[in-house]
Design a protein with these regions (language model features):
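Bacterial N-terminal signal peptides that target proteins for export
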Residues: 2-10
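Bacterial N-terminal signal peptides
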Residues: 9-20
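N-terminus-centered regions that define maturation/targeting leaders and the start
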Residues: 24-225
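Short, flexible coil/linker elements and helix-boundary hinge sites characteristic
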Residues: 4, 15-17, 211
Length: 225
């Protein structure tokens, strides 16, 4: 019965789950064995097969992001993987995040985690929080829990591609190669997007495009064998 539940979880994940390898109990999450060049904490020099998804957007100044939970250029820890999507040991705990050096004129932040390698044709957004006040410069670990009580007042978690207003951990298909998880803090020149929690990540990014004035990114390249 346990195996069947894992198979169902992988199906619900639309190919983002761990697939047959985990259903059989043979899959394992590992750090990249490929050469990955990264400047710690700013995500500015990664080598990857696909273009940086932010390269297609208007250029904005970068600022610094860091974390006591995840490291730029290193795999996601197991706690940041998705038990919801069937990864054994995955806990769907959002990482601790802090940031500094953002542009003057910042009025709010959006925090997100995105996997451009997900086999959907449009990637997969694991987490989005909008309307984070400019006075907030950190989020504690597990701030992305369902019905979180540790997000700052006024912040809103969007439903995300999993259809749940919470952080959903990584769960790439076993054997699909490296997936680069972009954990991004976006600085906006508006205090609120005015968008509800049901807004898709794509629509949010479209609506805030002209309001983005800075961006900080931590990239975690990870694969499941």
């Amino acid at each position: 019965m346990k195996i069947n539940k894992l198979r169902v979880a992988a199906t619900v994940a639309l190919g983002l789950g761990v697939g047959a390898a985990y259903a059989a109990g043979t899959g394992s999450a590992v750090a990249s064995s490929k050469s990955v060049s990264a400047k710690d904490h700013d995500g500015s020099s990664h080598q990857r097969d696909l273009p940086n998804p932010y390269e297609f957007l208007p250029k904005v100044p970068s600022f610094k992001a860091y974390s006591t939970t995840v490291r730029d250029g290193h795999a996601l820890p197991l706690a940041q993987w998705s038990g919801v999507f069937g990864v054994p040991g995955g806990k769907d705990i959002s990482p601790e995040l802090s940031w500094y050096g953002f542009p003057k004129g910042t009025k709010s932040f959006v925090v997100s985690m995105y996997d451009p390698e997900a086999p959907t044709g449009s990637g997969f957004t694991h987490w989005t929080v909008e309307d984070i006040p400019a006075t907030t410069t950190s989020l504690p670990e597990n701030a992305g829990a369902l019905d979180s009580t540790t997000l700052p007042a006024g912040a809103i978690q969007l439903d995300g591609d999993a259809g749940m207003p919470r952080y959903i951990g990584g769960a790439p298909p076993a054997g699909s190669g490296l997936h680069y998880y972009y954990i991004t803090i976006t600085a906006l020149n508006e205090s609120s997007t005015g968008l509800p929690a049901t807004t898709s990540a794509a629509l949010l990014n479209f609506e805030i495009d002209s309001h983005v004035i800075g961006r900080a990114t931590i990239v975690c390249p990870t694969e499941i064998n």
